[in-house]
């Protein structure tokens, strides 16, 4: 930085000025050079005083913010999580233990009728109080394994001390999970939630799939305790999370609980049958607190999800002694999954991008497709375009995660033994009644004639799958083999390259020629190893 030139004083002017000015003036009259950058001058007392005043104001502001935060937290705990309800040794804890051991410790029979104001911890899984099963007919029905009629605000079977049965349908996109979920959604004794982790992925977009696994598990942990306020954390910006209603939950327009009495007069939960989303969207929106009340009435709570990639992510929930969680792993031929992903590629573009971001950068790419001219930078949107490329690229991450889960299931640790069941989609559509009975037996539900007929109707329809995100009655054979005529041979070989490990475990045979693919008389299914 150049110095600006200073005008010279005439001879003899400086002594005269020094004599006429006060003692402090010489410094002021001397030529003033520009201050160098970074040079610090001694602070004046006035400046230090102003600085101290600002520091005090800032500290006071931080202290006030801390106090307001603590008050807000205490207010939340007072309304949402009463401390005396959480204490097993408190009066309500003793009442809960006497009513059947709500914290896992069976207590002695109650000496008298329970007090009306004593209620269980709302955060713990449902366990019927003694009053709910005190009647002799209800107790006899529960011991005989017959579903007792809903009453006293509870549904389903269960005796004193029984835990709520929790189920997670563990699967991936385009695996027939919407139809499989309806087998629980239509059951009058089941509270069903459809892909609630969708809210996490939408809120935290564009986070990759692997980094969102912890948040997904935390949401499931809250939902299995009927704490539906967790939806408010992941509501869209500007939508007012505290004012979120039932109709703001993903999949609510086809949820049988949301669309049925007492939340909505459009349908009845005990009547088996699909709901019309156009009718359900006209239902009055209900507060989440009201939805929580309905959740606590059901003994069986089922959540279907496609955004948990490894069963090990659920290990903390499976280890939790307060939760009785079982995992149903719904699988489908990866080639059929890939074909369905391509057909619905535009509806899954965001999810495909989030999954592809989780790929190992050192992993191989797609040699079969690249050799056939499928490039990521392709301009066209048809076959071989970028949407197809991402749809198939996501299969690498999905199949690698599936291989890890199956490896864990082949040698199950303690937390997974007796809590894991594999169901192939091909077996479901091939023999729906047998598969339904197997699934219901695993989770402790009774198969009604209405549910058997519903499963048969859904797999014997004449409709096609032109609308990939709508559940409808379809031809089972057509749905199971559609990939053999929809995919090119290069696409099939690329999927097999990604998924050969889970295919070997699950009993899906690989193909060797295009002629073998087109020969629909040859089955490519064999007995699975699980």
Curated annotation (Swiss-Prot):
Topological domain (Lumenal) residues are: 76-530
Can you say where in the cell this protein is located? Answer: Golgi apparatus, trans-Golgi network membrane
**Substitution effect: residue 475 to A:** Unable to sulfate the sialyl Lewis X tetrasaccharide
Q: Tissue range of expression?
A: Widely expressed. Highly expressed in bone marrow, peripheral blood leukocytes, spleen, brain, spinal cord, ovary and placenta. Expressed by high endothelial cells (HEVs) and leukocytes.
Q: Pathway it acts in? A: Protein modification; carbohydrate sulfation
The consequence of residue 296 to A is: Induces a strong decrease in enzyme activity
Entry's InterPro entries? Answer: Carbohydrate_sulfotransferase, Gal/GlcNAc/GalNAc_ST, P-loop_NTPase, Sulfotransferase_dom
**Membrane topology (UniProt):** Single-pass type II membrane protein
| Post-translational changes noted in the entry | Glycosylation at Asn-475 is required for catalytic activity.
Cytoplasmic topology: which positions? 1-54
Segments crossing the lipid bilayer: 55-75
A molecular-function term among this protein's GO annotations: N-acetylglucosamine 6-O-sulfotransferase activity
Q: Which GO terms describe its cellular component?
A: cytosol; Golgi apparatus; Golgi membrane; nucleoplasm; trans-Golgi network
Name of the protein described by the UniProt record: Carbohydrate sulfotransferase 2
Organism in which the protein naturally occurs: Homo sapiens (Human)
Report the gene name. Answer: CHST2
């Amino acid at each position: 930085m150049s110095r600006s030139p200073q005008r010279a004083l005439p001879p003899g002017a400086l002594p005269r000025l020094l004599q006429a000015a006060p003692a402090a003036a010489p410094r002021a009259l001397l030529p003033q050079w520009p201050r160098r950058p970074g040079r610090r001058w001694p602070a004046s007392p006035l400046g230090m005083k102003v600085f101290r005043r600002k520091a005090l104001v800032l500290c006071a502001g931080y202290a006030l913010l801390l106090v307001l935060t603590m008050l807000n937290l205490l207010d939340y705990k007072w309304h949402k999580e009463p401390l005396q309800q959480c204490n097993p040794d408190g009066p309500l804890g003793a009442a809960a233990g006497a009513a059947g051991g709500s914290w896992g410790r069976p207590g002695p029979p109650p000496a008298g009728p329970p007090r009306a104001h004593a209620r269980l911890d709302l955060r713990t899984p449902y366990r019927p109080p003694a009053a709910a099963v005190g009647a002799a007919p209800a107790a006899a029905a529960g011991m005989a394994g017959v579903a007792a009629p809903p009453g006293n605000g509870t549904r389903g079977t269960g005796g004193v001390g029984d835990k709520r049965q929790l189920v997670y349908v563990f699967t991936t996109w385009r695996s027939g999970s919407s139809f499989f979920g309806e087998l629980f959604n239509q059951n009058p004794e089941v509270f069903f939630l459809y892909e609630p982790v969708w809210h996490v992925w939408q809120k935290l977009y564009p986070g990759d799939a692997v980094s969102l696994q912890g948040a997904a598990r935390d949401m499931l942990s809250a939902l299995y305790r009927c704490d539906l306020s967790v939806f408010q954390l992941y509501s869209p910006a500007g939508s007012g999370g505290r004012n979120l209603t039932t109709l703001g939950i993903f999949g609510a327009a086809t949820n049988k609980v949301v669309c049925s009495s007492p939340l909505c007069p459009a349908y009845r939960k005990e009547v088996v049958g699909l709901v019309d989303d156009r009718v359900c969207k006209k239902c009055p929106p209900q507060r989440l607190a009201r939805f929580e009340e309905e959740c606590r009435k059901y003994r069986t709570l089922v959540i279907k999800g496609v955004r948990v990639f490894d069963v090990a992510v659920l290990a903390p929930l499976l280890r939790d002694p307060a939760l009785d969680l079982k995992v149903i792993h719904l699988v489908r031929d990866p080639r059929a999954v890939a074909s369905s992903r391509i057909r619905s590629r535009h509806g899954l573009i965001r999810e495909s991008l989030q999954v592809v971001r989780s790929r190992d950068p050192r992993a191989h790419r797609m040699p079969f497709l690249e050799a056939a001219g499928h490039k990521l930078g392709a301009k066209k949107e048809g076959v071989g375009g970028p949407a197809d490329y991402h749809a198939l690229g996501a299969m690498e991450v999905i199949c690698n995660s599936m291989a890890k889960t199956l490896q864990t299931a082949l040698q199950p640790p303690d937390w997974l033994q007796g809590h894991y069941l594999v169901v192939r989609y091909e077996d479901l559509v091939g023999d729906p009644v047998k598969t339904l009975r197997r699934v219901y037996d695993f989770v402790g539900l009774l198969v009604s004639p209405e549910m058997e007929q519903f499963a048969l109707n859904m797999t014997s329809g004449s409709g096609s799958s032109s609308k990939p995100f709508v559940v409808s009655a379809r031809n089972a054979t057509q749905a199971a083999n559609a990939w053999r005529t929809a995919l090119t041979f290069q696409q099939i070989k690329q999927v097999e390259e990604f998924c050969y490990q889970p295919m070997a475990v699950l009993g899906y045979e690989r193909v060797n020629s295009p002629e073998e693919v087109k020969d629909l008389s040859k089955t490519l299914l064999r007995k699975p190893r699980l």
